[in-house]
Amino acid sequence: MASELAMTAELPTSPLAIEYVNDFDLMKFEVKKEPAEAERLCHRLPAGSLSSTPLSTPCSSVPSSPSFCAPSPGGQPSAGPTAAPLGSKPQLEELYWMSGYQHHLNPEALNLTPEDAVEALIGAPHHHHHHHQSYESFRPQPFGGEELPPAAHHHNAHHHHHHHHLRLEERFSDDQLVSMSVRELNRQLRGFSKEEVIRLKQKRRTLKNRGYAQSCRYKRVQQRHILENEKCQLQSQVEQLKQEVSRLAKERDLYKEKYEKLAARGFPRETSPPAAPKTTAADFFM
């Protein structure tokens, strides 16, 4: 029976499947005895079913498991687009279902022991393309036709708006925004939203104010340097004038001292000239 199972249902021998199966100890499960009716229920398919999955056992409320029973001799595979082929290989998720719900399987209906199941899993031939398909089935599926939640829509819209906002700001450099006239800027901003235009104009106003403040600061610093240079020149001139004043004061003191010395020696006074004799009228007539 194990060989027939290995032939009809080839299972992948990928390291992932082997490691997952080895994590479970199949020897600790006991074989549950079921009546022969369970075997008939295992082989019986529901009417109008497109899958090969049989009905679950009457005593179990677990959903129907993947089919590990041989199909009935008279059964014909369905020709629908979703119908699985008769000899199709079970997917890797069936292994996960089998390992997770081992206590719901019917070993008596399968006529298998835990050792036979392990041998069938390990001894199956390896197919690279089938392993790739089985592994791809466990990858997270995209949303597809499902509707995205409002948070995702908001995040996508915010990301798109942020990206569009960055593209608008990257379109103009700071120098272009400052040097561009208002008419030219309005012509360039045609077609953009009002919010983005206001934000860009606010950025331009901020840049112009910053440039004006830097210009005022530069002029103030330049004027300070000019005033400091003038101050230094005036201070040097004052020092020169002070030196000239001190030199003139010394020269004045020297001349004053000479004058005082000459005045102390006492120069002789000049005698007055003699007075002319008085002529009388008699002398005049004589």
UniProtKB/Swiss-Prot annotation:
Q: Has UniProt tagged this entry with the keyword Ubl conjugation?
A: yes
What outcome is documented for mutating S272A in this protein? Reduced phosphorylation and decreased induction of lens differentiation
Q: Gene Ontology cellular component? A: nucleus
Question: Compositional bias (Low complexity) at which positions?
Answer: 51-85, 277-286
What's a single GO BP term from this record?
insulin secretion
User: Residues of the signal sequence?
Assistant: none
UniProt subcellular location: Nucleus
Question: Per the record, which residues fall in region Disordered?
Answer: 51-87, 126-167, 265-286
Q: Name one GO molecular function term.
A: DNA-binding transcription factor activity, RNA polymerase II-specific
DNA-binding among keywords: yes
Per UniProt, the keywords (alphabetical) are: Activator, DNA-binding, Nucleus, Phosphoprotein, Transcription, Transcription regulation, Ubl conjugation
Q: Where is the composition biased (Basic residues)?
A: 152-166
Could you describe the post-translational modifications of this protein? Phosphorylation at Ser-14 and Ser-65 is required for transcription regulation activity and lens differentiation in neuroretina cells. Phosphorylation at Ser-65 may be required for efficient phosphorylation at Thr-53, Thr57 and Ser-61 by GSK3. Ubiquitinated and degraded by the proteasome, following phosphorylation by GSK3.
PTM annotation (Phosphothreonine): residues? T53, T57, T113
**Which residues does this entry mark as bearing Phosphoserine?**
S14, S49, S61, S65, S272
- The organism sits in which domain of life? Eukaryota
Note down the stretches annotated as region Basic motif. Answer: 199-224
Q: Which PROSITE patterns has this protein been placed in?
A: BZIP
Q: Where is this region: Leucine-zipper?
A: 227-248
Q: Which family does it belong to?
A: Belongs to the bZIP family. Maf subfamily.
Per the entry, what this protein does is: Transcription factor involved in transcription regulation during lens development, including that of crystallin genes. Binds to CRE-type MARE 5'-TGCTGACGTCAGCA-3' and TRE-type MARE 5'-TGCTGACTCAGCA-3' DNA sequences.
User: Subunit comment for this entry?
Assistant: Forms homodimers or heterodimers. May interact (via leucine-zipper domain) with MAFB. May interact with FOS and JUN. Interacts with PCAF; this interaction impairs MAFA ubiquitination.
Q: Know the name of this protein?
A: Transcription factor MafA
Give the gene that encodes this protein.
Answer: MAFA
